[in-house]
């Protein structure tokens, strides 16, 4: 069984920063801490509306990361140009709707083969490895192999959102079957979306999995497990100011 890697998505550090229009918390600092804690890579989604990660974040992260940068992005001319200029180690192509809270589903690779083939070729020519964010669907997996993507990232949202054990088991079986097919076609398999401390183990146990990209759950846990130290430090500074 191959080594399983963790890509930490730091988008929500930027979400918190942008909520008040400040320069903190700094996604670059968060990336450094994540790397020190064992992250194998850092994932950021540069959305068209720049709601969290910014172009500046992407440039600085590319220059400062000690691990690998995975840039999630829509398949648009603007984003392709940014990727070719920035040259992250990986690009994960995702569908994007401006009104969505987070990415809601996988790419329709089968329905836009030429567009995906061109994007994969353009990124590969810049030395960037490409993954396609797709549902655990046989048609989409076959299409991903056809358009020349070396990686897929299986959308685990339906698994994560399953309301019963039976539903979750059904979704897990779909993901396992999809991963087996992808590996048979020569694709490397990543997964992500909605993975938490409570549901990650079953996905991590699948032998075909190469990397899991997880963000919201990690940042949410960090708010709690790091909160004691943050509160104590603030109180110390306040008392220090009073002499």
UniProtKB/Swiss-Prot annotation:
InterPro entries xrefs: Aldolase_TIM (IPR013785), PyrdxlP_synth_PdxJ (IPR004569), Pyridoxine-5'_phos_synth (IPR036130)
Keywords linked to the UniProt accession: Cytoplasm, Pyridoxine biosynthesis, Transferase
Keyword Transmembrane (UniProt): no
Pathway note: Cofactor biosynthesis; pyridoxine 5'-phosphate biosynthesis; pyridoxine 5'-phosphate from D-erythrose 4-phosphate: step 5/5
Gene3D superfamilies: Aldolase class I
Subunit structure: Homooctamer; tetramer of dimers.
Role: Catalyzes the complicated ring closure reaction between the two acyclic compounds 1-deoxy-D-xylulose-5-phosphate (DXP) and 3-amino-2-oxopropyl phosphate (1-amino-acetone-3-phosphate or AAP) to form pyridoxine 5'-phosphate (PNP) and inorganic phosphate.
Protein name: Pyridoxine 5'-phosphate synthase
Natural source organism: Salmonella typhimurium (strain LT2 / SGSC1412 / ATCC 700720)
């Amino acid at each position: 069984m191959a080594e399983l890697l963790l890509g930490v998505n730091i988008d929500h550090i930027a979400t918190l920063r942008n909520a008040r229009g400040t320069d903190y918390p700094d996604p670059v600092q968060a990336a450094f801490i994540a790397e020190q804690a064992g992250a194998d890579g850092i994932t950021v989604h540069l959305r068209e509306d720049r709601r969290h990660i910014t172009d500046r974040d992407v440039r600085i992260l590319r220059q400062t990361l000690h691990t690998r940068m995975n840039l999630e992005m829509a398949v648009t001319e603007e984003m392709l140009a940014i990727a070719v200029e920035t040259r992250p180690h990986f690009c994960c192509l995702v569908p994007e709707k401006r009104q969505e809270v987070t990415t809601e589903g996988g790419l329709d690779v089968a329905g836009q083969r030429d567009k995906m083939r061109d994007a994969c070729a353009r990124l590969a020519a810049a030395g960037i490895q490409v993954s396609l964010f797709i549902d655990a669907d046989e048609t989409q997996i076959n299409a991903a192999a056809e358009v020349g993507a070396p990686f897929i990232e299986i959308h685990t949202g339906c698994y994560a959102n399953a309301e019963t054990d039976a539903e979750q088991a059904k979704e897990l079986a779909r993901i396992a079957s999809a991963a087996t097919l992808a590996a048979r076609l020569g694709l490397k398999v990543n997964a992500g979306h909605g993975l938490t401390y409570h549901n990650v183990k079953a996905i991590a146990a699948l032998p075909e999995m190469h990397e899991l990209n997880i963000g919201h759950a990690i940042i949410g846990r960090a708010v709690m497990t790091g909160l004691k130290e943050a509160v104590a430090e603030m109180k110390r500074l306040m008392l220090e100011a009073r002499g």
